Amino acid sequence: IGKVAAATTTTVLLTEMACQQIIFTGVAGGLGADVRVGDVVVADALLQHDMDASPLFPRYELPGLGVSRLHPPADLTARVVGAVREALSPHALSVNGPLRDVHLATLGLSQPRVHQGLIASGDQFVSAAADCDTLRHHLPGVLAVEMEGAAVAQVCHDFGVPYVVLRTISDRADESAHIDF
């Protein structure tokens, strides 16, 4: 868990295992108004919400890179979004027949959806409504918050390796996040 661990692991995958691309998955807290527990968010941009080297650099800017948001390759992102949409389609999920709806209802979930947008990463487990409001205020349009994706993106960017980050929403990053997670 955390940006350093994710960056270290990604570096090993790229240098020792010669991975040609990285598809990074996991869970995140949902921040977007329409993002629900069980939904999947595929990043079209990643940002370290706890990066602040001001006054030397603007808040969120990655020193040495001159950018605050990292963008996965659009073609790879589009392929992953398509694959997730297919996997979450009612037809694909109907493999379990009527039991699928029972399982979703038991967990208090509805039909999962896929979203595409900004994922914010930081070395903290966000579990307070006030922190969510702060993130939404400073990062309009942010869909999810987690602890590793932007670090993986930065390492892949530095090595010139294509990547995509997708997260299943496990909680709403609020006061019950530690239970829902």
Where do the model's predicted regions map?
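Proline-aspartate-enriched helix->loop->beta-strand connector
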Residues: C19-I23
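Short loop/turn motifs at secondary-structure junctions
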Residues: A18, R36, H115, G141, ...
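Mid-sequence, gly/pro-rich, charge-dense loop/helix-turn segments that line enzyme active sites
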Residues: L31-L139
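Short gly/pro/ser/thr-enriched loop/turn and capping motifs at secondary-structure boundaries
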Residues: K3, G30-L31, Q48-D50, R172-D174
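Short glycine-rich, acidic/polar surface loops and turns
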Residues: E146-P162
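N-terminal short beta-loop-beta anion/metal-coordinating cradle
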Residues: I1-A18, Q48
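Regulatory input/activation interfaces that engage signals or partners
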Residues: F159, Y163, I169-F181
